[in-house]
């Protein structure tokens, strides 16, 4: 799969979580901050990244850089996704279902951030299994990356869309 050039896109960032993590050493605890960020152009491109640093702004900056390296293209049909899909990652599972125009983004927390920045405006989703933000985001991105348009599937099979849909 080809890499998407982030410099050609107008990306928007959204910080999902900031977590203070500790390393216990002989003299006490050493604190660092872990940031989880989602970036997207609201037009079919989205990515997520993590960063860790001594200070919060540095962790966010690192997470944004990481997210720009992990962009994926999301096939959209109007304001929604082409078909129902389940995204999996670890114990996290996210169910994504296309919705009629005007429904809005029905999703919780981290999943909502990914879907909104991907440019999906109408969708139904349900988080199943793990509700850890990183697992939910990875499961959502996994599901979105496996989406295919009817035209693409028809082309792969050498058929017309009408033949495919019956």
Swiss-Prot record:
SUPFAM superfamilies: dsRNA-binding domain-like, Ribosomal protein S5 domain 2-like. GO terms for molecular function: rRNA binding; structural constituent of ribosome. Residues 11-74 form the S5 DRBM domain. PROSITE patterns: RIBOSOMAL_S5 (PS00585), S5_DSRBD (PS50881). GO terms for cellular component: small ribosomal subunit. Pfam families: Ribosomal_S5, Ribosomal_S5_C. It comes from the Bacteria. Keywords: Ribonucleoprotein, Ribosomal protein, RNA-binding, rRNA-binding. InterPro entries: Ribosomal_Su5_D2-typ_SF, Ribosomal_uS5, Ribosomal_uS5_bac-type, Ribosomal_uS5_C, Ribosomal_uS5_N, Ribosomal_uS5_N_CS, Ribsml_uS5_D2-typ_fold_subgr. GO terms for biological process: translation. PANTHER family: MITOCHONDRIAL RIBOSOMAL PROTEIN S5. With S4 and S12 plays an important role in translational accuracy. Located at the back of the 30S subunit body where it stabilizes the conformation of the head with respect to the body. Part of the 30S ribosomal subunit. Contacts proteins S4 and S8. Belongs to the universal ribosomal protein uS5 family. The N-terminal domain interacts with the head of the 30S subunit; the C-terminal domain interacts with the body and contacts protein S4. The interaction surface between S4 and S5 is involved in control of translational fidelity. This is Small ribosomal subunit protein uS5.
